A protein has these predicted regions:
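Surface-exposed loop/turn elements that mediate protein-protein interactions on large endomembrane-trafficking
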Residues: 6-33, 53-74, 96-117, 138-155, ...
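Repeated scaffold domains used in trafficking and secretory/extracellular systems
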Residues: 28-46, 73-85, 116-129, 156-169
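C-terminal amphipathic alpha-helical segment
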Residues: 63-65, 76-80, 87-91
Length: 185
């Protein structure tokens, strides 16, 4: 919403069980964010959830009544986000030099990895210990420690890419096939 010329986003937590039974409209929590858009909210597990803004994110804890535990200002524009049960990750527009930056945080909101990279990838996911980024046939894989594993051309336009059993083996799904590939540096 916008009040005057100030942009505001509101995160509302509902509980349709016993904890929300006595609350108006089952609302058990509300948090307003000024001058920020919150386009994504997800659960990492049954008691930790994350609200992602355009320049920050907030970690909430509590299964029945989520409470904001910390809010982290990222300091750069968040282009995309990804997560696992252990990590919160972002692709950021790198303001210091051309290109982008991938940044990884643990559930507590502590930064654990930061790595600059070039290229634009609209698909970003974390599977196991790897951050897999791809767009068309271009691909970049970085480990959770920030070590580049692969950057190159897959020779197939990927709609989905996941690790498979075997060393450097991945399954790549395109519009008309599922292909097993082995990546070499």
């Amino acid at each position: 919403s916008s009040v005057g010329s100030v942009l505001k986003s509101k995160v509302v937590c509902y509980n349709f069980g016993e904890a929300g039974a006595e609350q108006t409209d089952k609302q058990v929590g509300t948090e307003e964010y000024e001058d920020s858009v919150i386009p994504e909210i997800y659960f990492m597990d049954e008691s930790v959830s994350v609200a992602v803004g355009d320049h920050s994110f907030a970690v909430y804890e509590g299964g029945q009544v989520p409470v904001k535990k910390r809010e982290i200002q990222v300091g750069q524009e968040i282009r995309s986000s990804f997560h696992t049960e252990k990590y919160i990750g972002f692709v950021l527009l790198n303001q210091e030099k051309s290109g982008y930056e991938v940044r990884l945080y643990n559930k507590a909101g502590k930064q654990v990895m930061n790595r600059a990279f070039t290229g634009e990838y609209s698909n970003v996911q974390m599977v196991g210990d790897e951050i897999i980024m791809y767009e068309g046939s271009a691909c970049c894989i970085i480990t959770k420690a920030g070590v580049p594993r692969f950057k190159g051309d897959l020779k197939i336009d990927a709609l989905l890419m996941v690790p498979a059993a075997g060393f450097n083996k991945y399954l790549v799904m395109s519009t008309n096939e599922l292909r097993a590939i082995y990546l070499a540096k």
